[in-house]
Amino acid sequence: MAKNRKTPDMNLPMWFDGQNINEALFCEEFLQERRIIFANGAFFTPDGRVTDDLPLRGEIYDKLKFCAVNNIPRKITNILEVLKLEAQVPDFPPEQDRIHLSNGTLLLNGTFTEGRPAIVRSRLPVAYNPDATAPVIWLNFLDGLLYAEDIPTLQEFIGYCLIPSNKGP
């Protein structure tokens, strides 16, 4: 089947010469099409840290399947290793002034930016809604659990859990 697809008039990608896959060129093209970096031993995307590389392997397979015939899993593993080198960034520090949410980014000063323009360390699967009503059940639970003066302390602690810092304002 692969022999039928190796015709001279076919528009082959730069990384495929008709018989071999150039992993470095494949990774360059892949990084032009997809926002992803590699830092601190992990891949990061606009959705946050990639904890399972199976979807990434699937994307690579989808691009390779028309030209790779032998040892496809090993070829994908090799490409992932080259991708780590190609996408490597020297420093990817945490952003301490923002919380990335499913529909955008909430800055600690209260401003909200919609969309996912940047590669981030983490993104919570919760949508920001500035018009949300008070969480009555949660507040009743806290009222039954703590003294009224202790509730702000717990809320502040939970807030610190959402940002990569333990410094106060």
Briefly describe each language-model feature range.
Residues F16-R34, Y147-T153:
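Phosphate-interacting basic helix/loop segments used at nucleotide- and nucleic-acid interfaces
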Residues R34-P55, I99-H100, T105-P169:
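P-loop NTPase catalytic core of nucleic-acid-dependent motor ATPases
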Residues P8-D17, N70-P73, Y128, A132, ...:
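Extracellular glycan-interacting surfaces
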Residues M1-M10, A42-N71:
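Short, small/acidic-rich helices and loops at N termini and domain boundaries
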Residues N11, W15-I21, L25, V69-L106:
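Extended, Lys/Arg-enriched charged tracts that mediate electrostatic binding to polyanionic substrates
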Residues A2-R5, M10, E28, E33-R34, ...:
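Generic cytosolic/nucleocytoplasmic N-terminal low-complexity/intrinsically disordered segments
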Residues E29-F30, E59, K63-C67, I79-V82, ...:
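Residues that form generic nucleotide/phosphate-binding pockets
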